[in-house]
C-alpha cells in the first residue's frame, strides 16, 4: 500500500507539471470587437516596452533616442501575453527631424511574474496570430497614420532623406541584399 501511495503521489505531481505547461488561450482574442487596440492600458506592459526601446536606442550607433513612445496593445493569443504596437519618434544623430515609426513586439509574463519583450517570435501559431490581428481595422489605421507621419517627416527634411538613404545602403551592404 505504501508503494501505491508513493506512485499515486508521483502521478499527481506529473499531472500537475503537465497542466502547468499547457497554455490557456484568451477567448475571442482574434476578434477585433472583443480585443480592441488600447493605448497605454497596461502600465507594466508600457513600462517594459519603453525600456526595450530605450535599450535599442542605447545600442544603435546611429540612433540618439526613441522619443514619445506610445504603446498600443491587444491581448496575446494566450493568458498573460500581449501584442504591443509601439509608435515612436526616432531621433537620428545629427538630424533635426525625428522619424515616426511603429514596431511590433510580443510581451509575455516570465516565471518571476514580470514581463519581457520578444521582438522575434519563433512559434508559428503566435506569428500567425500576430499577422492576423495586424489586419484588424484599428491596427491598420494606426499603421496608416504612422506611414503618413513618416512620409511627411521625410518630405520635410532633405538631410533626413539623405540619412535614411545612407542607412538603407549600409544595411543592404551588410546583408548583401
Question: What do these predicted ranges mean?
Answer:
Residues 1-177:
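Mature, Sec-exported extracytoplasmic domains of Gram-positive
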Amino acid at each position: 500500500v505504501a508503494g501505491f501511495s508513493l506512485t499515486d503521489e508521483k502521478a499527481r505531481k506529473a499531472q500537475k507539471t503537465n497542466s502547468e505547461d499547457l497554455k490557456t488561450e484568451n477567448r475571442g482574442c482574434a476578434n477585433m470587437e472583443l480585443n480592441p487596440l488600447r493605448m497605454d492600458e497596461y502600465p507594466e506592459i508600457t513600462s517594459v516596452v519603453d525600456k526595450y526601446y530605450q535599450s535599442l536606442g542605447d545600442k544603435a550607433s546611429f540612433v540618439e533616442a526613441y522619443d514619445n513612445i506610445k504603446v498600443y496593445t491587444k491581448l496575446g493569443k494566450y493568458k498573460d501575453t500581449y501584442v504591443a504596437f509601439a509608435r515612436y519618434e526616432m531621433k537620428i544623430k545629427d538630424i533635426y527631424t525625428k522619424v515616426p515609426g511603429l514596431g511590433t513586439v510580443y510581451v509575455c509574463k516570465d516565471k518571476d511574474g514580470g514581463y519581457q519583450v520578444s521582438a522575434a517570435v519563433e512559434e508559428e501559431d503566435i506569428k500567425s496570430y500576430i499577422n492576423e490581428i495586424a489586419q484588424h481595422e484599428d491596427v491598420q489605421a494606426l499603421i496608416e497614420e504612422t506611414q503618413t507621419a513618416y512620409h511627411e517627416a521625410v518630405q520635410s527634411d532633405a538631410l533626413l532623406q539623405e540619412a535614411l538613404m545612407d542607412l538603407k545602403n549600409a544595411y543592404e551592404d551588410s546583408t548583401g541584399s
